[in-house]
Structure formats: structure tokens, C-alpha cells
Amino acid sequence: MAALFVSLLALTSLVPVQGAATVPQTDYAKRAERVLRSAPLIDGHNDLPYAIRRSTNDQIYDGKLPFETSLKGHTDLPRMRKGRMGGQFWSVFIACPSDPNAPINTPKFATRDTLEQIDVARRLVDKYSKDLMYCDNPGCAKRAFREGKIGSFIGIEGGHQVGSSIAALRQAFYAGARYMTLTHNCDNAWATAASTVRAGKPDLGMTDFGPALIKEMNRLGMLVDLSHVSHQTMRDVLKITKAPVIFSHSSAYEVSKHLRNVPDDVLKTVAKNNGVVMVTFVSSFVKVDDPDSADVNTVVKHIFHIAEVAGWDHVGLGGDYDGTTELPKGLEDVSKYPYLIEKVLEAGATEEQARKLVGENVLRVWTEVEQIAKKIQRSGVLPVEEVWKGRNGTALSERSTFIEGPAPLEYGCD
């Protein structure tokens, strides 16, 4: 009887589990393909909408934007399909003021331009709805993958894009944005940027107004993105946020000492926070001392370092395609993702770990952020109304006299 049991056990060990026994362990390309069939590859940051703005002024219907055949940059539909992409956070980036030290209270066009970028991103998805699906929640992202479409989500890259206004942030959320990077390459009313520290200025972290922003993002269910912020800002936010954070396109500081990357103490805190660091590919970030020699294995090294320090539950992918001209050998455009996953498996990751890396982790974070927001809203917490100290409420507030009654014609709507 014992012999029979052993024989049956031996037979059951040969039964393939989800195809696992049908692919040799050393066939990394086929194993990568299996990973990408079973989990959506979700990239945290792609600047195609800004490339469209620069090349066509956001005009996509006149036949001059061949997204369905071939574009000049890093991203188009054929290459996304070749890259087995399951989801993309499209950055609706608008640059910081030309003078990063300009007074933040000076009216700017960034908020208007951000709305235009949200608009073109959503119109692009609608135009190519056979292949793309706009989603504003993780459940929809999973459904898009099941239906063979590429989930398309929206992220804002810097608080300057909403004029350092929590009310404007809310409206951007209602328009479809699901994450906001707290800063780009300029400080704002909420936080210090990494670029400020890189320029030799002090790292002041979050401002006194910063916690109000995090409170509202947590309440809304908007992902807090800590790429581009200073190291002290990272630490300050992680002390107060009630929800997991993301780094939409950052790598490991211990591997490459660029201030855009995440130091080990922060990686450990991200693990406690249940967040995710989505590794970027920018050559000067991943190999600051010799960017020209960066290759796919350089990126793999960053992935494994984050996995070793924070755990495989806290690492993802955020290439920054169409947002840089510096890309490692082997990762020249979005079609190269299967090759990256092949190299991750070859370096020793399991298929379970690879599935977490490509998309399961960021979906888990997004789901938890939504759940926490619903709990906060059910508790009766009201929208934040706070503004930063000293802000002028309107342009008229700078005038020396207050006029009662109907405004003169020059101030009116006529």
C-alpha cells in the first residue's frame, strides 16, 4: 500500500500546474511569455501625451499621428502589443515654470494646460478603443486585461500642474487623474523637489501645507506619487499618509547615487507602508557614474536591490518612455518589456515574483488606496478647504480699493 502511495505521488508530481511543467526552467523567454499572459504588465509612467502636445499640438484626428502604425518616439500601438503591455499610466505632464524659483502665487497656465493633456489622453484612448480601455479604478484595469485590451490610466506629474491648489487637485481627480507626483523639477506650496537639493539648496521636505494635501489625496483615493520629490519629502509623507504610496518612476539610490532614486531607509518604510517603487529606466538615473554603459542588466540590478531591501511585494516598473532620450541597451522602447522579464527570471526571480513585479503589486496598492478612501469618506471626513498662508484669493485682491455693487464693465463678463 505504501508503495502504491509513493507511485501515485510520483505521478501527481508530473501533472502540470498552470503549464508550469511544460516549459523548461531555462527557457526564460517562454517563461516570461507565460508571466505576461497571467498578469497585466502595468507601467507607471509614460510621457506620450506630452510628445503628442509637442508634435501635433494635441491634434489626433488629422492623420498626422500614426499611433496605430508607427511613431518616432518610444511608444505606439504595435510596440505596446509586442511588449505585451496590459496597462499604462499616461503622464499628463506640463513643465515647471522656466524659472523654478518664480513665486508660486503668480498665475500660470499650467492648470489649463494640464486639463488639455487629460483631454488628449482620454481622446486618444477613445479613438483607439479597440485596443485601449480608459480606467479610473483597479477593477476596470483587471477587466481590460481579461478582455485583451491595454488599460489606460492618468497621472499628473507635479503639484505645480494644479497651481498648488487642493480644490484644483479635486477637479483633476474628477476629470480622471488617479495619481499626482507631489513635485516635478520645482518646489511648490507642498514640498521640496529632488532637483532643488541637487542644485545645492537645503532639503526642507514637506511644508506646513503639505499634510493637508496628503489628507485630501487619501480621502479621494488618489495615489500619492513620490517620484521627483526630495528624500526628506519622501520621509515626511510616509510618516503621515494613511494609504500606501507609489514611486511611479524611480530606482534604487544605493545602486546609483542619483537624488531621483530612493534610499534604503525609505525603501524599508515603503515596505511597512505597503507601497510600491516602480523602477525607471533612465540611464543617468540607473547608472549615474557611466550612463552610456547602462543596459538591461543594470535595471535588473535595481529591481533585485529593491526586492531584497523592501521585498518582492513592493517593486514594479515605470520606464519613463517618451520622457527621456537616455535609455539602456536592450530597453530602447516599450516593445522590450518581455526581454526585461526574461532577464529578471534568468537572474533568479520566480514566476510568482515576476507577476508581482509586472503588475500585481501596483494593482494591490491601488485597490488598498481605494478601500482606505471609502473608509475615510464613510467616516464623514469633509473635503479639505485649506490654502497656503499668504495666498492671494483673486487677482482683484491686489487692487487698493474694494468696489461694492456691480463691477465696472472692464471687470465683468460682458
From Swiss-Prot:
Domain of life: Eukaryota
Glycosylated residues (UniProt): N392
Residues involved in Zn(2+) 2 binding: E157, H228, H249
Cofactor(s) demanded: Zn(2+)
Record keywords: Dipeptidase, Disulfide bond, Glycoprotein, Hydrolase, Metal-binding, Metalloprotease, Protease, Signal, Zinc
Binding positions (substrate): H184, R260, D320
PROSITE patterns: RENAL_DIPEPTIDASE_2
Protein name from the UniProt record: Putative dipeptidase ARB_02715
